[in-house]
Amino acid sequence: RHLPVAAKLVREFPDQPFVVDHLAKPAIRDAQVSPWKEDLRRLAEFPNVLCKLSGMVTEAKWKQWRDDDFHRYMDIVLDAFGARRVMIGSDWPVCTLSGDYASTMGIVIDYVQQLPAEARENILGGACARFYGISPSPQTGSEPIEHEPLSP
């Protein structure tokens, strides 16, 4: 419901980079894509906007979801933004309300295995490094650094 307003904000600040968290919270629980899909596509028209593949499990039926429940939503995001403007995110610790950390991250990590290497590298680290102006890890290239989440 915030995407139309977000598009107005982005239009006003064309030089400001923006990240859409949690795919802008589509209605995964209800298996709906509209109007989210159309609104997201309009926002993706702005080159200064990226989208995070995160927060999906809390939009699904808690602890009852399957990885493939999220594929069509990730397909829509990749089609709208392109892999160069999509990044992985964890939504930790909130994601643990609906699944464990490893399973939550595994949704995106497993999904991107079907993509070409360059797209995988962008989603799993490259887009994030460019957006935040940081260098990818020298040990892993643009792959994310694996670590245990910090305890609260």
Where do the model's predicted regions map?
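Mid-to-C-terminal alpha-helical segments outside catalytic/metal-binding sites
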Residues: I76, A80-M87, T96-P152
